[in-house]
Amino acid sequence: MKIGRYIGIVVVCLLSAGIQAVNPSGTLPIVYMTTNSGQPITDKENYVPGTVYIDPLNTGYAALGTSTAPLTAQLKGRGNWTWSGFDKKPYKIKFDVKQTVLGMPMNKHWVLIASADDWLGYLRNPVGFMISEAIGLRWTPRLVPIELVLNGKYQGLYFLTEHVRVGKNRVNIREQTDLCTNADSITGGWMVEIDNYWTENNIEFDENNGQHVMVSLDVPKVLSSVQRTYIVNQIEALNNAIYGNSSAALEQILDIKEAAKYYLVQEIMEDCESYHGSCKLYKDRDSLGTVDKWKFGPVWDFGNAYDRHAERWIYDEPTWAQYWIGQLATWPVFQNAVKEQWWIYYHQHKDAIRQQAIDFANRLTEAAKRDAQVWDGTSNFRNNSNMADLRNDFINRYNWRINWLYQQWGEGIPPATEGVERTQTDEVGRKMLRDGQLIIQRGGKTYTIQGQILQSEY
């Protein structure tokens, strides 16, 4: 009786151990991350010392360190909802020495995105980044899918990603130091974020439509009184220009082309949280009498992309407040810039991005199955084990959105090479035609601002 009972206990223990012993799929690079003494990573504020090495397997990437000579680094948690709402945690890596990682340019700072909130085959962030890169925002974070082993335990599928920060190979503007008081230096090196989380140095104001807006500071973080006065005045001036009546004033403070590119990425991805949180803007230093303009970007979080699946603009009855963009979209100069970027994307990139998304999803298939084995049954678990179905679902949503935008904009407006010819200017700097209809003339064709052809010389 006792022998049989012991055998049963052993079998149960072995089965339980087998359930937990999920191994990497071997189809992606493996990141081995180990904390000193095996201590857990329990918060986002305090770094834990440790080591990292990367085995690329047969993926074509270069190795980084080895099991016997790993690289020293500082490790901590990161994220907001993705940190608090899921057992599968995202992480930040800060190498002691700058490293080139999986073909991405040298830097100390990297993040491991868990994508535990993505139920569309882990494709939201990767494809959002692909579109941003294709459209040509000045800098787009790069990422590589990997499998993570933390303190000897397999954690599943992650995305090793460039950390958004000011610096060479990232947002390449001149850095501004904390507590700076120099009048010239404080005009640039800013990166801020329209945020939905309160921080101590937040700038808060009421948008002209009554919505309360919080802007957090990425760089610099600790402000002198001179810096704070400058940045508060800049945010106020930007808000006033967006809600003002002068196109010239808007174009003087905001880079319209970059704003149009950023918006188009969000509209294609149908991201209804895109101007609510993780919406970044940056500004370089003024120089030689030239005032540098604020630029939207870089893109970051597409965690709610394609959630709504609605035939309306991302700022039209949004799930979350979409700050500034609803008003910005009323400006003809902005509409025109968006139509130009849409023309380029529609003719040059839409099909290539679709295929890139399919190929990327196929790379994740086996790792996604292993990830589901690890995290099934945990908090807010999203099951991405059936990548073929989820890939098809994502592509259908992408195609649907492209088709809906085509119904609104047509093929867009061909970009001008030497400015725009129009017939007259109204009292607020908007371009008008005889009866008040907005037009644009290019390449022998006359378009409405919606992209419809009025007449052609051909």
Task: Place the predicted regions along the sequence by residue.
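Bacterial N-terminal signal peptides
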Residues: 8-17
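Conserved NTP-binding catalytic cores of kinases and kinase-like/nucleotidyltransferase enzymes
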Residues: 22-127
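Middle-to-C-terminal accessory/interaction subdomains
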Residues: 28-29, 39-41, 48, 71, ...
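Internal "kinase-insert"/substrate-recognition segments embedded within catalytic cores
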Residues: 94-100, 107-109, 114-116, 136-141, ...
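Residue-level detector of functionally pivotal "anchor" positions at catalytic/ligand-binding pockets or at interdomain
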Residues: 410-442, 453-454
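Short, glycine-anchored, charge-dense loop/turn motifs used at functional sites
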Residues: 447-452
